[in-house]
Structures are given as structure tokens and as C-alpha cells.
Amino acid sequence: MLLSLRKNNEFRTVYRRGKSYANDLLVLYVYPNRKNVTKDGERFNKVGVSVSKKVGKSVVRSRVKRLILENYRLNSSELKEGYDFVFIARVAINGKDFKQVGKAMNNLIKKAGLRDNEKIVHSND
């Protein structure tokens, strides 16, 4: 199940206290959140996506959000748990396809050291 960051203060906490990693298409903020625990003691992640109006019109911004969330969904089982993630799209992401966005995301995840193991799922490979 994909849990989202929804409230402004959740995003602000990740921006202020989290660590950032960047490449040419995306910026990733990561914050280890101790509150991300179920009643059974299982940890989980939350994800938020921010796409500025500079990226394009609403159709383009929505497509970018869908690409980011789908790539995250495919790789979420391989990530360490108990974190809040915020992906910020840069203007250069406009016009990029699914694989290019996935490659950029995997690069940031690797930089941040968030893989549970070395296996990352790639679609269409």
C-alpha cells in the first residue's frame, strides 16, 4: 500500500529536518520518521511528490507525478522502512519517459543508501 504525505507540516518537517539528494531530473528529501510504525510494530514509508508550475501545464505536471509514483511503487519493496520521502521534479523532467525517470530515481535512492538489498525492480528489462 502506498501511503502519502498530505499535510503541509509533514512536507515542511521533511524539508527542514531531512537530508537532500539531487540529480538533473529530481531532488529527493529523506527523513527517518519514528512515527511511521503500525500498532503491530511494523515500520512503513510515506511519499510525497512536488511538481512546480515551471515544469508545465497541469496535464504535464500530473503525468510527471504519475511517473514518479509508479516508479516508487515498483521499487518500494526494496527500500528500507520508516522514512518519509519527498520527490521534487525539476524542469528538465518535462518530456522524459518512464525509464529515464526510473533511472533518475534509482540513482537518488542509491546515493541516499536506502536500498534494503541490491536488487531493484526495473520494468521492461
Curated annotation (Swiss-Prot):
Keyword Transcription applies: no
One GO cellular component, as annotated: ribonuclease P complex
The family database entries (SUPFAM superfamilies) matched by this protein are listed as: Ribosomal protein S5 domain 2-like
Molecular function (Gene Ontology), one example:
ribonuclease P activity
The EC class name is: hydrolase
Enumerate the InterPro entries for this protein.
Answer: Ribosomal_Su5_D2-typ_SF, Ribsml_uS5_D2-typ_fold_subgr, RNase_P
Q: Would you say which domain of life the source belongs to?
A: Bacteria
Q: Which GO terms describe its biological process?
A: tRNA 5'-leader removal
The chemistry this enzyme catalyses reads: Endonucleolytic cleavage of RNA, removing 5'-extranucleotides from tRNA precursor
Keyword hit for RNA-binding? yes
The alphabetical list of record keywords is: Endonuclease, Hydrolase, Nuclease, RNA-binding, tRNA processing
Q: Which Pfam families match?
A: Ribonuclease_P
Give the family, as the similarity comment puts it.
Belongs to the RnpA family.
Subunit-structure text: Consists of a catalytic RNA component (M1 or rnpB) and a protein subunit.
Protein role: RNaseP catalyzes the removal of the 5'-leader sequence from pre-tRNA to produce the mature 5'-terminus. It can also cleave other RNA substrates such as 4.5S RNA. The protein component plays an auxiliary but essential role in vivo by binding to the 5'-leader sequence and broadening the substrate specificity of the ribozyme.
Name of the protein: Ribonuclease P protein component
Q: State the organism named in the record.
A: Clostridium perfringens (strain 13 / Type A)
Gene symbol of the encoding locus: rnpA
